[in-house]
Amino acid sequence: MSQRPNPSALIWLLLSALVIGLDQWSKAWVLSSLPEYTSVPVIDGFWNWYRTYNTGAAFSFLSDAGGWQLWFFTALAMGISGLLAFWLSRTARGHWRSALPYALVIGGAIGNVIDRLMHGHVVDFIQWYIGSHTWPSFNIADSAIVGGAIGIAVFGLFDKAGKQAS
């Protein structure tokens, strides 16, 4: 009797799809409801809606590079997403410490790729600030990428520590 293989973590791509859906829904709302470059307070002294656009990457990196960066960041995001999806296919379904952050990064990366291909830029709209110190505007896809990257780093450290201890 042959053993049934463990199911892969590809089911976690449903979380990626959820991130993509929420990201695109929120950006559609922003484009139809918020004025450009105008702060709309959500929590005074901390949080605004602020519709802006980013042709670069994190913190507007390469935003003034002349247009080639759209294709560079699209290819980079698709390559990373493909690699993470491959890793998901090699990960056991129940190993959520790997699957969850991979799925978040995939969903966020693809959400921003959709923007780049549809609009030529990424739509950002969440603005956090304290006093005169303002964090660069971001979106749901960015939040998923950062959360996933933190998860990969933190859970990777814990997994290595656990393996070394045993």
From Swiss-Prot:
Give the UniProt subcellular location, in the record's own words: Cell inner membrane
State the InterPro entries in the record: Peptidase_A8
Q: Which GO terms describe its molecular function?
A: aspartic-type endopeptidase activity
In short, the EC number is: 3.4.23.36
Keyword Magnesium carried by entry: no
- What keywords are annotated for this sequence in UniProt? Aspartyl protease, Cell inner membrane, Cell membrane, Hydrolase, Membrane, Protease, Transmembrane, Transmembrane helix
Q: How is the protein disposed in the membrane?
A: Multi-pass membrane protein
Metabolic or biological pathway, per its Swiss-Prot or TrEMBL entry: Protein modification; lipoprotein biosynthesis (signal peptide cleavage)
Concerning PROSITE patterns, the annotation shows: SPASE_II
Residue numbers annotated as active site:
D124, D142
Name of the protein this chain belongs to: Lipoprotein signal peptidase
Q: Which organism is it from?
A: Xanthomonas oryzae pv. oryzae (strain KACC10331 / KXO85)
